[in-house]
Each structure stands twice: as C-alpha cells, then as structure tokens.
Amino acid sequence: MLFRSSTAGRSKARASTVDPTGIVSQSIPARRVIGCVVYPASELIAPGVVKHIEGDRFPVGELDGSSSSERVNRISACFTNAGFKAPVLDDIRAEIWLKLWGNLTFNPISGLSHSTLVDICQFPLTRELAASMMREAQAVAHKLGIEFRVTLDKRIAGAEKVGKHTTSMLQDIEAGRAPEIDALVGTVVELARLTDTPTPHIDTVYALVKLLGKGMDEQHGQVRLQPMAVAA
C-alpha cells in the first residue's frame, strides 16, 4: 500500500524492507486486500494483556482508491456496530501515510531517548528534529502522489495530545523484543532512494536506531532507564 505509486515507472515497485523476498506480494494479490489504519494507542502490559490508551478510529478503503465497495461498506458497518469509528475513505493510501508520518518520527526518537510522546513534543530540540523528519517524509510522499489532509503542526499537536504514552518501539526496546525498525523507518528510507529525495534527518535517526537494534540482537539484551537510589 505504501509503495504502490501512481508515479510513472514505479507502479510495480515493492519495498524490500517490509517484503524482502516478495513472498507477501506473490502470495496475497492486492485485490484481496482491504486497507485499514489502526489509530488507537495501546500498551502491552503483560502477555496477552493490552491496555487501551486512547482512540477508536479504524478508517478502511480499497487500495486502488476506487469508490467504496460493498465489502468495504460491510466491514465499516461491523466496526461501527461494535462502537468504533470506521469511515470509508477513497484514498486509504494517504491515510496510511498520515499514520506512518508520525510513526517513522516519534517511534525511533522515543526508542533512542526513552521519552514519551508529550516529552518529545514539548522538548524544543526533539520537536524540531521530529518536524524535520516529517518534512522529509512529506516530500517523499508527494513524489508518490500522496497529499496529506492535515498540516505538520497539527500532526505534532495530535501526538502531544496523546500525553505520556510509550511508543511501540520503546516498549519493544525496554522488553528486549526486536524493535520494528524497517517497517516504520526503513521503508521511507527506501522510498526516498527510489524517488531521489534527500532525507538526511531520517537517515541519521535510522542509522542510530538500527545500530541499537543490532546491539540488542547480538547481546540478547534490553535497554531500560532505571532510577538510581538516592542516598539518605
């Protein structure tokens, strides 16, 4: 969905960072897939136990950007009847990019700094870093025919509003699980190369978080900030 571009010559492109061998695209025809963006923020607090933080939106849509189909409308109705918001969108790819816009930025920054969303957004240096990464990602998306429906400032404000939420990447790093780096950041780096778009800030953060992931894998370790004992 992210890499199927309307740009000439790139419609058949496949992002190797998320489908290295091509087995997903070969095994599951695109026509069998319905796009959905999961907006609720949550936290894995125990095996099999997920704590819901906020959010109830699950936008859905056909991948080819066609008008709503019967199957999409049925899925939307099921979500709605269960108490969720599931609007049917004509351009689900743009909505996926909107979600990715924040994920590729806040996830690695939080993983490297061990900070929550509100901490990142309210600290001037990391807020500007996030904005720089988002500007670069937006340039990549524009070359792929994607237009964002919200401004950069509004997207950052939305992340700040979530509050003291620990991102999924930071949760993985603290728990010693392999962080989801390539799907969230590496894909955009790959698409930037495909579209000849410079992304210096994204590249730098990607290199750092990849090195962290490599160290965790080699040491079978986790990285967590621990409070120090204060002498009486």
Give the location of each predicted region.
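A generic short alpha-helical patch detector that favors 3-5-residue windows
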Residues: 33, 67, 101-105, 129, ...
